[in-house]
Design a protein with these regions (language model features):
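Conserved beta-strand in the GNAT
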Residues: 57, 63-72
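Conserved GNAT acetyl-CoA-binding A-motif
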Residues: 112-122
Length: 158
């Protein structure tokens, strides 16, 4: 049974600052506060003007307590669009209430409705609570993959 006190909805254009606060909360949880360079203006432009990604917000008893930021990828093997979940975060005071599961249910509904092939994401290897949560949901770990990155300061060297 879903908790009526919890509402999952798409973020509105006026909520760039709230999204940035949640990103900072995630960064603090991951011990990466110094890595957040995004500004409210960048969040607004990339999410609501360029529409580079989408954001779901979780409200608990009328207060915003979490977010899920995702964008679309494509599988050449499946011939289908996928959802890539970049970030999922629920504030500490709202954890354990089923909000993470509701985010995934919402993403799964989007994927079903649009005929997408997968929902994929990565998780920090030390984040045991999240790993257990994902396993409990039936997610599979792809041990044969590694994530690589070229940052913007290296683009010209490629």
């Amino acid at each position: 049974m879903e908790n009526k006190a919890i509402n999952i909805r798409f973020a509105q254009e006026t909520e760039s600052e709230v999204i940035l606060e949640l990103i900072r909360g995630l960064a603090a949880y991951e011990n990466m506060e110094d890595e957040v360079a995004a500004t409210k203006e960048q969040i607004h432009e990339t999410l609501f003007i360029n529409k580079d990604a989408e954001v779901l917000l979780a409200e608990y008893k009328g207060k915003i307590v979490g977010f899920a930021l995702f964008f679309h990828t494509y599988s050449t093997f499946l011939g289908k669009t996928n959802i890539y979940l970049e970030d999922l975060f629920v504030k500490e005071e709202a954890r354990g209430k089923g909000i993470g599961r509701l985010f995934f249910k919402h993403l799964a509904k989007i994927a079903i409705d649009k005929g997408y092939g997968r929902i994929e994401w990565c998780c920090l290897d030390w984040n045991q609570k999240s790993i257990e949560f994902y396993k409990h949901m039936g997610a599979e770990v792809l041990d044969d993959r590694r994530i690589y990155r070229i940052s913007d300061d290296k683009f010209k060297e490629v």
